[in-house]
Amino acid sequence: MIGRLHGIIIEKSPPEILLDVGGVGYELQLPMTCFYELPAVGQEATIITHFVVREDAQLLYGFNTRQERTLFRELLKANGVGPKLALAIMSGMSANQFVSCVEREDVSSLVKLPGVGKKTAERLIVEMKDRLKGWISHDLFTPYTDAAPVDHEPSLAPADTVESEAVAALLALGYKPQQASLVVSKVIKPEMTVENVIREALRSML
């Protein structure tokens, strides 16, 4: 089991990064809410991980805090929720926002997430409400304290590259091609980074 990785980010392709750890490159997928907080390419990062083994693949999912990973694992326990849907849910809203939606039984907000219909939203609330009780009040979602201070400032890419990468990220999270292209075209502005475009796109759909 791989529980934590510390290395240098050598590639970013939302929602995936390539992390160099002692000369070995690890591919990790992160919720966009975690991706936004990553340092720039070329800098060190500490990633809390969840390892998934399937018949056809071995996958690593990354998080900034152990508590975010705990929420991911709690989502996986819910009926009908796999890693891809859990990743999409945690990309569409922060951990605190999701817990708040569950506590308030806010079906209307949950159904705006990709892959979450009314029945899935209702099931998530029923299955997770007791397990998540008190998470926000205990302030569990705090940054991983072992991580060194980092520069989060990303470098700007050409506008067409930013747009295509933002659309690709939304597709990877489960959004439909037409929806992804439309929302990105609406929110993109000059000088925006890929992460900024994705953040605004996801925010506009909630």
Swiss-Prot record:
Keyword Protease: no
UniProt-annotated stretches for the region Domain II: 65-143
An example Gene Ontology CC term for this record: Holliday junction helicase complex
Predominant cellular place of this UniProt entry's protein: cytoplasm
Keywords: Cytoplasm, DNA damage, DNA recombination, DNA repair, DNA-binding
Region described as Domain I: spans on this chain: 1-64
Subcellular location: Cytoplasm
Residue span of region Flexible linker: 144-157
Keyword DNA-binding attributed: yes
Entry-linked SMART domains: HhH1
Region spans: Domain III: 158-206
Gene3D superfamilies: 5' to 3' exonuclease, C-terminal subdomain, DNA helicase RuvA subunit, C-terminal domain, Nucleic acid-binding proteins
GO molecular function: ATP binding; four-way junction DNA binding; four-way junction helicase activity
Record comment regarding domains: Has three domains with a flexible linker between the domains II and III and assumes an 'L' shape. Domain III is highly mobile and contacts RuvB.
Subunit details: Homotetramer. Forms an RuvA(8)-RuvB(12)-Holliday junction (HJ) complex. HJ DNA is sandwiched between 2 RuvA tetramers; dsDNA enters through RuvA and exits via RuvB. An RuvB hexamer assembles on each DNA strand where it exits the tetramer. Each RuvB hexamer is contacted by two RuvA subunits (via domain III) on 2 adjacent RuvB subunits; this complex drives branch migration. In the full resolvosome a probable DNA-RuvA(4)-RuvB(12)-RuvC(2) complex forms which resolves the HJ.
Function noted in UniProt: The RuvA-RuvB-RuvC complex processes Holliday junction (HJ) DNA during genetic recombination and DNA repair, while the RuvA-RuvB complex plays an important role in the rescue of blocked DNA replication forks via replication fork reversal (RFR). RuvA specifically binds to HJ cruciform DNA, conferring on it an open structure. The RuvB hexamer acts as an ATP-dependent pump, pulling dsDNA into and through the RuvAB complex. HJ branch migration allows RuvC to scan DNA until it finds its consensus sequence, where it cleaves and resolves the cruciform DNA.
Family label: Belongs to the RuvA family.
HAMAP family: DNA_HJ_migration_RuvA (MF_00031)
UniProt name for this protein: Holliday junction branch migration complex subunit RuvA
Biological source species: Tolumonas auensis (strain DSM 9187 / NBRC 110442 / TA 4)
Gene that this sequence comes from: ruvA
